[in-house]
Swiss-Prot record:
NCBIfam families noted in UniProt: lgt (TIGR00544)
Pathway: Protein modification; lipoprotein biosynthesis (diacylglyceryl transfer)
Key words of the record: Cell membrane, Membrane, Transferase, Transmembrane, Transmembrane helix
Protein role: Catalyzes the transfer of the diacylglyceryl group from phosphatidylglycerol to the sulfhydryl group of the N-terminal cysteine of a prolipoprotein, the first step in the formation of mature lipoproteins.
Transmembrane intervals: 18-38, 51-71, 89-109, 116-136, 177-197, 205-225, 235-255
Pfam (any one): LGT
Record membrane topology: Multi-pass membrane protein
Species for this entry: Listeria monocytogenes serotype 4a (strain HCC23)
Name used for this protein in its record: Phosphatidylglycerol--prolipoprotein diacylglyceryl transferase
Subcellular location: Cell membrane
InterPro entries noted in UniProt: Lgt
Gene of this entry: lgt
A GO biological-process term: lipoprotein biosynthetic process
GO molecular function: phosphatidylglycerol-prolipoprotein diacylglyceryl transferase activity
Family designation: Belongs to the Lgt family.
Amino acid sequence: MGNGVQPLDPVAIQIGSISVKWYGVIIASAVVIALLLALSEANKRKMDKEIIVDLLIWAIPISIISARIYYVIFEWDFYKNNLGEIVKIWHGGIAIYGALIGAVLTAIIFSRIKKISFWQLADVVAPSLIIAQAIGRWGNFMNQEAHGAETTRAFLEGLHLPDFIINQMYIDGAYYQPTFLYESLWNVLGFIILLIIRRTKIRRGELFLGYVIWYSFGRFFIEGMRTDSLMWGDFRVSQVLSLLLIVLSIGIIIYRRVKMNPPYYMEDKFGKVVKKK
């Protein structure tokens, strides 16, 4: 590569003709960390841990499929003439919002089958979701994707980024904004805020809705910086969906407080979640 800058090898392990890419390793690591955190949260809320494992078994494949369907829908101009590419997910092309939609629908159906509260289940997994997203963005980093507009090395150095990040943002002869990093850091901050909020008196379901609002707010602005956005006419799909989710989540919070009066929850000094009224 020109300018003496070499990108990181996206392949973690090479066994003969089989390549294990860092993207897959990072995503798998994110799932494992998310599961361990969700199991810890379930224990605090006195929920059967097997419920979390069972949910994950269903949610992972459904989320992958829904993430792919979401992407294909908004890139239909390409896929309508290349139908065989639809199933070739290893060529790239999944969307986090599609995965979240699939995960939420799975959780809703799962909670009804198991006869448990969807909102309680959603609160348990909310911290896991946002930290998994924070970790997962580093898979995009290794693939040199999900970046922003062209910039200069001087600008990136002005952000006091380590050289390995700056060098990885050198793509096809130009430097680009590390929007993957902006979103990852936004999600880490959101994770910390969720951990703080859960130690306050909060109503059931509002930890999850708070996660949706926080993530969507950050995604709206970061999406505006990206160069690979899925488009719906002249609009960036993720920005439109972010606004809708923010409004919907706030509306649900208001409606549930006024009409349903859900119970309060908070952590005690030992880290256990106790119910308040």
